[in-house]
Amino acid sequence: MFPSVSSPRTPGPGTRRGPLVGIGPTSTPRASRRGLSLGSAVNSPVLFSPAGRRSSVSSRGTPTRIFPHHSISESVNYDVRVFGSSLPVKIMEALTMAEADEQLSVHVDEGGWACLVCTEKLLIWKIAVSPVTKLSVCKELQLPPSDFHGSADLVALSYAATSGEVHSVQAVSVMVATKEGSIRYWPSLAREDTYSDTCVDLGGEKMCRFLTAVQGGSFILSSVGSQLVRLIPESSGKIHQHVLPQGQGMLSGIGRRVSSLFGILSPTSDLMLASVLWDRGGSSFYTLTSSNISKWELDDSSEKQVHSWDVHRTLKESITDAVWGSESNYEAIKEGVNIQYLDLKQNCDGLLILAAAWHLGDSPCLVYYSVITVEDNGNQMSDAVTVEVTQYNPPFQSEDLIACRLMVPNFSSQMTYLYMENAVFVCSTGTGKFSLPQEKIVFDTQGDGILGAGSCAGVPILFSRNSGLVSVTPRENVSLLAEDLEESLTSSVGGRGSESMVFETTTKNETVAHEDKTKLLKAAFLQYCRKDLGRAQIMADELFSSHTDLDSDPELDKAVTQISVDLIDDYPASDPRWAESVPQEAPGLSNTSLIILHQLEDKMKAHCLLVDFLHQVGLFRRLSSYPIRGTPMSTRLLLCEHAEKLSAAITLKNHHSRLPDLVNSAILLALNKRECEVPNSLTPADVFFREVSQVDTICECLLEHEEQVLREVALVSQEWAEVAIDVNTVLKDMLQAATHYRLNKSSMYSQEEVLGKEPEYVPWTATSGPSGIRTAVMRQHGIILKMVYPQADSKLRNVVMEQLVALIDCFLDSYVSQLKSLEKSSDQERYSSLEVEYLQKRSELLSPLLTLGQYPWAASLAEKYCDFDILVQMCEQTDNQARLQRYMTQFADQNFSDFLFRWYLEKGKRGKLLSQPISQHGQLANFLQAHEHLSWLHEINSQELEKAHTTLLGLANMETRYFAKKKTLLGLSKLAALASDISEDRLQEKIEAMAEQERFLLHQETLPEQLLTERQLSLSAMPVLTAPQLISLYICDENRRANEYDFKKALDLLEYIDEEEDVSIDDLKLEILCRALQRDDWSGSDGKDDPIEVSKDSVFVKILQKLIKDGIQLSEYLPEVTDLLRAEQLGSLKSNSYFEFVLKANYEYYVQGQM
C-alpha cells in the first residue's frame, strides 16, 4: 500500500543505498554517507536512538493488547514484551546460578521449542504465542564431553510430525555436537536417557560451527572450514555419516553464472564458513563463506551440489558503491574497503546476506551493516543485487569484535532484525513497497544481554538474559513518516488527537474556506500515515463529497498543490538555529534533522506518502490542473515536478559536500537574486536548501560563476579547467536525477482516465526565459564550445564533451516530453510550431559536434533523437557506407531510406543514390516512383528492362520543355524495349508506336538551319513544338528557301494534329497551299501559251506532283479551286486573272487527270 520512494542517485541496476546515520551516542552521522539509490531514499526515515528523542513513548498512542504482557524496554516504534508463559523453573535456576561471565547461548526453533546451552547441560522447553496456565514442558539433557563451551548453533531439533501439527515431546528428536565433532542423538525428547553417541572425523579440520536439521530426520554438521557431513540416524540407534559432495554434478544442467568452471571449493580451502541455511520448502541447503554461496539439493539419503556462486567480487562492488559511491575519491576508497559476511537467511524475495563493511581510512571509522537480497533462480543466481545499507553504523573497534546475526521472522515480509550481544536493530530488506521505521533497541541494563533469537508463528523472539523470551513487534499505529515530521504535521492541524475534532467542527459549515480545506486534507493525510486508511477515507470523502459528480474540483487541485509545496519548502523549525527564522505562518510540516541531506530525504519520503495517500482515498484520479509559471499544468505532473526538484536538490547537496566553493558561490548569487536574507545563525546553504521549489534558480548562477572564473583566471591554472568540469557535473547530475525520477516513477503519477484535455506539459527542466533551464543549457553549450574547448588539451576536451552531450540529452528529452503532451491535442498549430523550434534547436546543438569531429557523441544523440540529417552528414564525412546501411535497417519504420535518397537528390549525389546495394533496391524503387527521371536508371541497373522502357516512354511522352531530351528518352525507351524480354508481337507493336513518334520529331529535327538561325533557335535548347507550330515555321516568310519539300512536310504534319486541338485542318491546309502559291511569280507567261508548261516549275505544281506520287487522291485532298481563289491568304493573287487561268488549268490537268 505504501510505495517505495526514490532518491536521485542510482549506483547501478538492482542496488539500493540505505540511509547511513550513526546509532547511539558514540556514532557520528555523516552527510556524505547518506546516499540512497534511486528508489529508496525515503524507505527508511531517519531515526536516532530513543534517548535522543523529544517525544515520549506514550505520545505515539497505546496499542491494543491481546495478552497481559508487560513492556520490558522503551521503544518509540515497537512493542518489546515478554513472550508467552513464564520461563520453566529449570531455566530460571540455570540463569540465576550462571556466573556473570559464563557463556550461555539460546536457540529458538520455529517449531515452537527453545534450547538453552548452559555449561554441560542442554535445557529444552516448549514455547507458545499465547500464555498458558500449566507449566511448560522442560527437558534437561546432558551434553557430550568437550574442552570447549557448548553452542546453541550446534543444537538441532527434528520433528516427526507433519507440518502444521503441534510437535509433542514424543515427536521431537534432538542432536547436539561439540566443537571437536562429538555427536549425541536422542531419538525422542520424551526419553532423555535414551541416546547414542558417535564422532565425526574432520580430518584435521577446524572446529564445528553449525548443526542443522534437514530432510528426512537427518542433520548436516558444518565446520568452520566449510566441510559438510550428513548425519542420518537409523532406527537401531546407529548414525550413518558421509561427507557432502563438493564439485560434483556441476557440469550438467546448470547456468553459466558460476564464476569458474571449477569454482567449487575443496574441503581443504582456507575459506571461512559464515552461515548455513536450510530451505525446507525447496529441500535445499546453502552455505555462505567468505567468498561464495553454495547450494545442495537433498532427498532423504543423498545430496547433489547444484550451484556455487563466487559472490565476493559482486557483493563487494555493490556494497562499496552503496556506502561510499558519492565520495569524490571513490576510486581510491574502494581499494581499501573491508567486507565481512555474517549471516544468511531467506524470505520471499530470495536469499538475504548480512554483511559488514568498513574502511580504516575513514575518520571516524564506522562499520556499515547491510542486508543484501539475491534472487535464487533455481540453478543460478540472479545478476540483480539489492543492497540495503541500514542505519546501524557503530564505530569500528576490531574485526574480531564484529558480531551480528540476522533474523527474518516472517518469510512473506521484508522486516529483518539485526541482533548482537546487547541490542537488536529493526530494519527492512529495502525490497518491499514500504518499510517501517528503523530503530535500535538496547538491552544494556546490568547483567542483561541477548543470548539468542528466532521466531515462533512469525513472531520475532529474542532471549534476554534478564527477561527471558521477548517479542519485538511494530506498534499498531506507528506512523510511516519520520517521527519528527509526523509530530510537526500533527501540530499543524491542531495537535495530537485533535484531527477528528478539527474535522468535525469545520465540516459542519456548508462552506469551508480553502485554508481550512488544506488543513483538513493534511489531517486526513496524517491519519493515512498512521495506517488508519478507513478514517482517512471518510475525511477525504466528506471534505470533497459535494464535487463527486463534477469533472474536476479547483479547490482540490489548489489544496493538494499547497500541501505539496508546503512539504518540499518545509522549515526545519526544531533545528535550534532556525528557531528565530521560522515565520508564524509556517505550514507546520517541520522536521528536526540537523543534516540538510537528511531533511531533503525525509521530505522525499513524506511527498511519496502524500501521492500514495491521494491514490488510496480516490482523490488522485480527480486531480485536474493548476496554474504554474503563468500557464496551467496538470496537477499530477506538478506533484511529480516537486519530487523531481527534491531529487535534484539531494543531488546538489551531495555535490555541495564535494565542491563547497563552487556551490556556495552559486548559492550566494541565487539568494541575492531572490533577495533572501541569511540570518546570522544560519548558513546560506541552510536557507537555499530549505526552499526546494526554487532549487532550479542555482543553474543560472553556476554559469555566472563559471564565466567569471574563465575570464579572470589564467588558462594554465588548474582552477580554469576544473570550473567547467565541475559546473557541467552539477548541472548534468541535477537534470539527470530529475529526468530519472520522472521516467522511473511515471506509473506513480499516471491516471487511468484523464479528466478532459490536459494542458501542454512544460517540465521545469524545459523552462525558457532568462532564468530557464533551456536557456542555461544553451548558454553552457556556448561557453564550452567557444571558451573552453578551443583552449583545452585532448584530455579536458574528452571530459567536457562527454558532459556536454549529457546536458544536450537532458535538453532534447524535455522537448520530447513537451511534444508528446501535445500529440493528442487539437491545437496542431502549437504542435507544429514547437516541433519546428525543436528541430532548429536540435540542429544548433548537434551540428557543432560534427564540425569538431566528435562523431561518436554526435551519433549517440542523433540516433536517440532521430536527427537523420546529422547521421547522413556524419556517414558522408567519414565515408561509412556500412553505417548508413545499418541506419536504413534500424530506422526503417521512420523512413530513413527516403530521407537519405532525398538528401542525395538535393545534394546532387545521384551516383550514390543509384548505387545502393541490392538489399535497398525495393525501397529505392518505391522512392523513385515519385522521381521517374531517375527511376529508369535504377530499373536498368536492376535488369528490369521492360519497366525501364515503360518509364522512359512515359517520360518522353511528358517531355515538352526540351526537344533533344524527348528524342533521347524516346531512343532509350526503344533500346530498353529491344533489350527486354518482351514477346515479339508486343515488341513489334511498341517499336511501331515509337517509330511514329520519331517520324514526328524528325519534322522538327529537319527544320532548315537558315530558319533556325533567323529565329535564334537551337535544336538542343528548343522546346518540343506542336504540329501547328512546326507548320507555321515551315511556311513562314523567314523560311526564304522554302521549297516543295518544306510545304509537303507542312501538309504531312496535318496528320499529327489531334482532334482535341482547337485547329481547323482544312483552314490550315488552305493556308499552306496559299503560302506555296505565293512563293512563285504569276505575273506573265514569258511568251509561252501552255499554262501547264508555264507553271511546271512552280512550288505549287511540284507539291501536286508529290501528292500524286504518294498516291493521294487530289480531288479529295485539295480544296475546291473556287474556295482557293477566294482565300484571303492569296492577297493580290485573288485579282490576277492570269493566275486564275493557270490555277484552274493545273487543277483541271492534275485533278481530272487522276480520274
UniProtKB/Swiss-Prot annotation:
GO terms for cellular component: kinetochore; nuclear envelope; nuclear membrane; nuclear pore; nuclear pore outer ring. Gene3D superfamilies: 1.20.58.1380, 1.25.40.700, YVTN repeat-like/Quinoprotein amine dehydrogenase (2.130.10.10). The modification Phosphoserine is found at residues 7, 27, 37, 40, 44, 49, 71, 130, 479, 488, 492, 500, 1132. InterPro entries: Nucleoporin_Nup133/Nup155_C, Nup133-like, WD40/YVTN_repeat-like_dom_sf. The modification Omega-N-methylarginine is found at residues 17, 30, 34. It is found in: Nucleus, Nuclear pore complex; Chromosome, Centromere, Kinetochore. Its main location: nucleus. The modification N6-acetyllysine is found at residue 786. Pfam families: Nucleoporin_C. Involved in poly(A)+ RNA transport. Involved in nephrogenesis. Forms part of the Nup160 subcomplex in the nuclear pore which is composed of NUP160, NUP133, NUP107 and Nup96. This complex plays a role in RNA export and in tethering Nup98 and NUP153 to the nucleus. Belongs to the nucleoporin Nup133 family. This is Nuclear pore complex protein Nup133. It comes from Mus musculus (Mouse).
